[in-house]
Curated annotation (Swiss-Prot):
Oligomeric form and interacting partners: Component of the Ndc80 complex, which is composed of Ndc80, Nuf2 and Spc25.
GO annotations of cellular component type: Ndc80 complex; nucleus
Gene: Spc25
Coiled coil feature spans: 74-107
Keywords: Cell cycle, Cell division, Centromere, Chromosome, Coiled coil, Kinetochore, Meiosis, Mitosis, Nucleus
The protein's name: Kinetochore protein Spc25
Subcellular location: Nucleus; Chromosome, Centromere, Kinetochore
Function per UniProt: Acts as a component of the essential kinetochore-associated Ndc80 complex, which is required for chromosome segregation and spindle checkpoint activity during meiosis and mitosis. Required for kinetochore integrity and the organization of stable microtubule binding sites in the outer plate of the kinetochore. Participates in SAC signaling that responds specifically to disruptions in spindle microtubule dynamics. The NDC80 complex synergistically enhances the affinity of the SKA1 complex for microtubules and may allow the NDC80 complex to track depolymerizing microtubules.
Family, per entry: Belongs to the SPC25 family.
GO annotation, biological process: cell division; meiotic metaphase chromosome alignment; meiotic spindle organization; mitotic metaphase chromosome alignment
Amino acid sequence: MTEQFDTRRRLMAMFRNEMRMEKLENTIAKKSTKFHTNSAALMTTIDLQQRKFEKLNALITRRCEDINTRTAFTRAVREKLAEERQKNAEMQAQLEKANDERIEQMDCVRTLSDASNTFINPSALPARLKGVTVLREEGRWISLDYDGDDLKGLSTFWAQAHSGSASQKWQQLLSMDKAIMPTLNDKGNVNVSVSSIIEIDLTASPSHK
């Protein structure tokens, strides 16, 4: 009887142990399933975050490239503006100098006109020399219309109508008129002296006096 009781007790203990093992296995299985589920969700979240990070990093890279490009462009524009300002200042100085020379040249034209009785159209200079020369002793006037480069024809005309000194001064004046009108791209200096041209003998009596 005692032996049967012991056997029954051992069987009950084994049954309880088996039940505890099954319960423990179920608990472990549930925890394992939950762990794997959480791990999968975490991996998915990490993957999404990684993709977002890559997109954000690519966007930041593009923005940095854009900023660098704009910075370089802004620097280039500023350098170009500074260069253009310098060119404009140089051209303005050239224009002012040419204008001063032109005014002085026009004064010279008037002086030579009065001295030689030759009156020209300033707007035709320097391409052509157009106007009239008055021969008061002969009571007549002669029109002239010469190409600005025809120095031989001009020399012949002035030699016949006026003194050799006046002829040379008119040729110098015409050459100077071409010299003081450089193009805007010409960086050379114009070194023409107008005052030297009018050094003719104005004390001599012109033909109309």
